[in-house]
Every structure is written in C-alpha cells, then in structure tokens.
C-alpha cells in the first residue's frame, strides 16, 4: 500500500464516524428533551426507558409544588393558582345585621 492509499482510507473513515455519531447525538438530545414530569391530584412518575415500576406519590400541598413546576415557570408566564374546592366546602359568607 502506498501513502496515498492509506490517506484515502483514513479520509473515508472520519466522515463515516461523523455520519454515525451526529445523528445519534441528535436522537439522544431529542429524547432527553421530551422527558417531562406531569403533576396532578395523585402524581405518577415513571421512567419510560429503564423498566422501573411506576412510583405513586401523594398530591402536593401547594399549587405547582414540584421543582419541575418551578423551573417551568421561568420560561412560561405565571398564572394565579386556581384550585377547585370539593363539593360542600364553601366558605360561609358572614352577613351583617
């Protein structure tokens, strides 16, 4: 083999590696940006990829109580907390005579 043939082989190797690594990095970044924590009355958190069982956590005591909600509020506009009350828990209005 001559030096010229060796350079051609090495030159072909680098673009092949780049053509494989760059799409893999793009896929990894896309998947990692899609992971979300959804908060509801009874939160269920699970990781889709490791096969761990779903972990049930009790509802938070405050509106937007998880750190994920705090971080999301940095780039989303803030809204007032609107929690609905269960039926029969209306606050009595004091009436003056």
From Swiss-Prot:
Its main location: membrane. Residues 1-33 form the signal peptide. One of its GO terms (cellular component) is plasma membrane. One of its GO terms (molecular function) is receptor serine/threonine kinase binding. Mostly expressed in leaves and stems, and, to a lower extent, in roots, siliques, seeds and flowers. A motif (SxS motif essential for MIK2 binding) lies at residues 60-62. Disulfide bonds: none annotated. Induction: Induced by drought, salt stress, jasmonate (MeJA), ethylene (ET) and salicylic acid (SA), mainly in shoots. A motif (SCOOP motif) lies at residues 54-67. Residues 75-97 are annotated as: Disordered. GO terms for biological process: response to ethylene; response to jasmonic acid; response to salicylic acid; response to salt stress; response to water deprivation. Disruption phenotype: Slightly increased growth and fresh weight. Keywords: Apoplast, Cell membrane, Cleavage on pair of basic residues, Membrane, Secreted, Signal. It is found in: Cell membrane; Secreted, Extracellular space, Apoplast. Belongs to the serine rich endogenous peptide (SCOOP) phytocytokine family. Interacts with MIK2 (via extracellular leucine-rich repeat domain); this interaction triggers the formation of complex between MIK2 and the BAK1/SERK3 and SERK4 coreceptors, and subsequent BAK1 activation by phosphorylation. Brassicaceae-specific phytocytokine (plant endogenous peptide released into the apoplast) perceived by MIK2 in a BAK1/SERK3 and SERK4 coreceptors-dependent manner, that modulates various physiological and antimicrobial processes including growth prevention and reactive oxygen species (ROS) response regulation. Prevents general growth and development. This is Secreted transmembrane peptide 4. It comes from Arabidopsis thaliana. The gene is STMP4.
